[in-house]
Amino acid sequence: MKKTVLAMGALALTLSFGAHAQISDGVVKVGILTDMSGPYSAMGGRGSVVASQMAVEDCLKAECKGMKIEILSADHLNKADIAASKAREWLDRDKVDAIADLTNSSVALSVQKLMKDKGGIAMFSGPATTRLTNEDCSPNGFHWMFDTYSQAAGTAAALTKLGQKSWYFVTVDYAFGHSLEKDASDVVKRNGGTVVGAVRHPLNASDFSSFLVQAQGSKAQVIGLANGGADTVSAIKQAREFRIGSGKDQRLAALLVFLSDVHALGLETAQGLVYADGFYWDYDDRSRAFAKRFEALNKGAKPTMVQAGVYSSVYHYLKSVAAAKSDDSKIVAQKMRELPIKDAVMNNASIRPDGRVIHDMYLVQVKTPAESKGAWDYLKVLSTIPADQAFKTMDTAACNLVKK
């Protein structure tokens, strides 16, 4: 398949074992709307399409026997208007039933509103904003894997409790970055720390030197990177180059790191980073078996938590359609909340009324080159953050689906 088709068109994969009588148009269609060419493409992108295909294959062998399922994919170019336009086209012209991945918080919020108004299931494994399960929650929107609170609760809480009390943030200037900075700031303050300042940078920035120098000049004990993907990689590389945040009086903390980021940085540069992750391929036998299948289809790359989340969300959606014997979004959304989430990716997982999927998270640390035993052996799990502690509780939620 040509890259232009993957990037701007719709990649269709139809896997069928005959039609399913209860499906409205005879086929269940899932769209993977992701970043195929920008700063988040390594953590999602083509790998998210691969993960969705694996979910289809697995469900057809089990709960989905006899169903016809089609996967579509497109590049949203990290633009909310393009994402909304493609999602609307899928819903109106292609009769897509569900959309997954949706990396980029601005993209996710635009599609959440559209799907809420027009119907259809939205499954978010790539964006981080907590607005998806608060003021912008939807009865047919589900937030998988992580959010800004889970990342702050893991990284910021761990470092603050170790005595790293004063923080300065380098923040990407859009909804995701603002949310990540706010949640991390709240966690720091709740644990007795202070925030001395912040500076914001554009998405996909190439030069972080001025932002990092400002952060260094703050004399804060921790420079917190409230960004993700290629921005995180670039910021860490440039910080190491200028020896910023590498001394005993000031350290660098990345609040959202993916396995693909560690791979891009290399262990020599990334070693010692501590962060929260929702999936690690070498965690147990199930995750290792899943990763082995995935890498064979994804040019040897192990899955990130975004890609693992696409697999889990698409599989759970499909088996919910099968159990409901319907692709009606209201019926399927209810069934998704009823059924347990059991797959090779998630541990101790369930869906709350606000659409937040809660599950165990892991506090991990990047290994040194000497500790690594081979390709992609990058992380060691320091501790498990239980599902009921990893995510913000609903008692302060701004979601109108939550009864108080």
Locations of regions flagged by a protein language model:
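Periplasmic-binding protein-like
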Residues: 90, 94-103, 123-125, 168-171, ...
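Extracellular/periplasmic Venus flytrap/periplasmic-binding protein
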Residues: 85, 130-131, 138-242, 279-289
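Venus flytrap/periplasmic-binding-protein-like
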Residues: 76, 130, 203-204, 245-266, ...
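Short, low-complexity disordered leader/linker segments with a strong preference
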Residues: 1-29, 398-404
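Beta-alpha junction/loop-to-helix N-cap segments that form part of ligand/metal-binding clefts
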Residues: 23, 27, 42, 46-48, ...
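Solvent-exposed, acidic/polar segments of extracytosolic/periplasmic ligand-binding ectodomains
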Residues: 28, 340, 344-404
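Extracytoplasmic "Venus flytrap"
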Residues: 24-53, 74-81, 103-104, 170-178, ...
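Extracellular/periplasmic periplasmic-binding protein-like sensory domains
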Residues: 236-312, 321-327, 370, 377-403
